[in-house]
Amino acid sequence: MQQLEEVVGQARAEIEGVSDIAALDEIRVKYLGKKGFFTEQMKGLGALSAEERPAAGAVINQAKQQVQDALNERREALEIAVLNQKLAAETIDVSLPGRRIENGGLHPVTRTIERIERLFGEMGFKVARGPEIEDGFHNFDALNIPAHHPARTDHDTFYFNPDLMLRTHTSGVQIRTMEHQQPPIRIIAPGRVYRNDYDMTHTPMFHQVEGLLVDEHASFTELKGILHDFLRNYFEEDLTIRFRPSYFPFTEPSAEVDVMGKNGKWLEVLGCGMVHPNVLRSVGIDPEKYSGFAFGMGVERLTMLRYGVNDLRAFFENDLRFLKQFK
């Protein structure tokens, strides 16, 4: 018994004296391993009588447990010390700035659409949307565009079948709105449109914003005032603006709107006019009671004029050197 107490004391002293886990494992093997001190002591129990064996075994196990507890306690302390040392070596300066993430930006065409929606929204216009695949009635017939009109040929229009096509303008949204809503109507219809054309100033897909107002006393004077306000707010300049006579099948009278450029030349920016009575009749609105006006503009053209871009195709080539200028 006294010998075991001495061994336990010696083991505890050795355990407290180690400074790393490898040395601690050597002590564990020395005392608790297959050939360790306590294993040999247990083997010696066979030499004792059956009456002495249980008491002696209990004493040995108690001493063995004391050594095991000392080993566990020391191992935990060493592991904590190793962890603290590792954490100290890997200290992070949390005050250092992080890696800069480059933020994206809206496409210039998207910026223009949002700007147009906001400016007309301030004048009481709501945004209306419709399908990009249209039928002949909504894309042509209801807009007073006859069957022989050149816009209806496959040179200008992408057809799926004789009566189904990619819309060539967002005017179909105006027709659908008038079919389902009684005047007063005050909407703009932004969206993608498609025409069979491709050069520096045309692409097969481009964006339009068309507007429509139908009420009992809509007038060309009101149309001019709205477009004057829009253009001056859009370009943020007190522009010189002119309305010159033009022709569109769906408006009468019709006009095109020009602004004076910095080079002293007129630049066409949009078309407009009073809604043709035939268009109102096609959707069940009485032209004797109601009148209306409509206008339409190419978003890419307005974007080119605002940002000084010369080639329309640059908007669709995904060149980051170009797009980063608009962030």
UniProtKB/Swiss-Prot annotation:
Keywords: Aminoacyl-tRNA synthetase, ATP-binding, Cytoplasm, Ligase, Magnesium, Metal-binding, Nucleotide-binding, Protein biosynthesis
Binding site for Mg(2+): 252
HAMAP family membership: Phe_tRNA_synth_alpha1 (MF_00281)
EC top class, as a word: ligase
Protein name, entry field: Phenylalanine--tRNA ligase alpha subunit
SUPFAM superfamilies: Class II aaRS and biotin synthetases (SSF55681), tRNA-binding arm (SSF46589)
InterPro entries listed in its UniProt record: aa-tRNA-synth_II (IPR006195), aa-tRNA-synth_II/BPL/LPL (IPR045864), Phe-tRNA-synth_IIc_asu (IPR004529), Phe-tRNA_ligase_II_N (IPR004188), Phe_tRNA_ligase_alpha1_bac (IPR022911), Phenylalanyl-tRNA_Synthase (IPR002319), tRNA-bd_arm (IPR010978)
Subunit structure: Tetramer of two alpha and two beta subunits.
The keyword Metal-binding is assigned to this record: yes
Catalytic activity: tRNA(Phe) + L-phenylalanine + ATP = L-phenylalanyl-tRNA(Phe) + AMP + diphosphate + H(+)
Principal place of residence: cytoplasm
Subcellular location: Cytoplasm
